[in-house]
């Protein structure tokens, strides 16, 4: 009989030693403090400082001090998977990517999620960034996609993988690179704002540069952009309440299509339905749009 199962009946439950110390090499996951320190050392201080300012976890400072029930990157992943003509690529530990893709498909996603694997060697030498760039270049087909969202999870963020060096566009396809580490984003609600804010920033710069694609539907009335995810029937009901005021419900941010971002920016006012969208509010304010709520 195998020695793996003792025959004397003295079995003890398996336990993981949580105080064994963080693994400092090989791309392994570590404690939040260790990962945060590594990310700052790798040049990500500006991003972490912005997240800390946008999403303070002090309960007295705002609504972001919530128990984290799952990887926050699920929020941004779900937003990307719901958008038309948008591809999503993840860079992170295989176990993290598996959990995120499993959860996203459990919630009804019917899109393929791109994944760029790494090893300790590719992480340390910088080859991971080259692999990401090669993958995005192969995926960037303007016939199929308006945008490609590339997301760094914990380990690539802590290692300083510079998604900003991918550029703004490849083959005419917009590239949105974001860092969504579990040690910097409180919950998946804030991660939705990270992506929505990044896309609004890109779209706002496009509008400033020249003509952009018209929305599929346009109201003759001034519109109210609705900031925060909601059920499909909610904008209809809100629109009925706005009609007597001479207003119409505009796009819901996060949007379902890239061109809706332009319509969202072209509004009379923004109604902040949810309290988590700090980065998005910053972009609307930069566009000169008043915020209510």
Predicted regions and their residues:
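An N-terminal assembly and electron-transfer interface module characteristic of large anaerobic redox
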Residues: 1-293
């Amino acid at each position: 009989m195998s020695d793996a199962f003792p025959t004397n009946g003295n079995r003890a439950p398996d336990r993981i030693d949580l105080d064994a110390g963080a693994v400092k090499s090989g791309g392994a996951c570590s404690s939040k403090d260790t990962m945060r320190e590594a990310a700052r050392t790798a040049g990500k201080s500006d991003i972490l400082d912005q997240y800390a300012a946008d999403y303070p976890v002090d309960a007295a400072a705002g609504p972001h001090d919530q128990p984290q029930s799952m990887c926050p990157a699920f929020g941004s992943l779900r937003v990307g998977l719901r958008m038309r003509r948008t591809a999503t690529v993840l860079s992170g530990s295989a176990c993290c990517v598996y959990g995120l893709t499993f959860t996203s498909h459990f919630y009804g996603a019917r899109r393929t999620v791109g994944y760029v694997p790494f090893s300790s060697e590719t992480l340390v030498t910088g080859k991971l960034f080259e692999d990401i760039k090669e993958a995005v270049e192969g995926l960037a087909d303007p016939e199929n996609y308006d945008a490609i969202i590339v997301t760094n999870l914990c380990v690539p963020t802590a290692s300083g993988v510079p998604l900003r060096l991918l550029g703004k566009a490849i083959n005419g396809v917009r590239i949105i690179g974001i860092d969504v580490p579990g040690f910097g984003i409180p919950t998946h609600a804030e991660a939705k704002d990270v992506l929505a804010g990044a896309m609004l920033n890109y779209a706002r710069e496009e509008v400033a540069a020249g003509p952009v694609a018209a929305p599929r539907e346009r109201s003759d009335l001034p519109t109210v952009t609705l900031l925060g995810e909601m059920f499909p029937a909610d904008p209809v009901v809100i629109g009925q309440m706005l009609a007597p005021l001479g207003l119409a419900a505009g796009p819901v941010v996060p949007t379902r299509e890239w061109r809706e971002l332009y319509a969202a920016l072209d509004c009379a006012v923004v109604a902040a339905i949810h309290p988590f969208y700090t980065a998005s509010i910053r972009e609307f304010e930069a566009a000169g749009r008043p915020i209510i709520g």
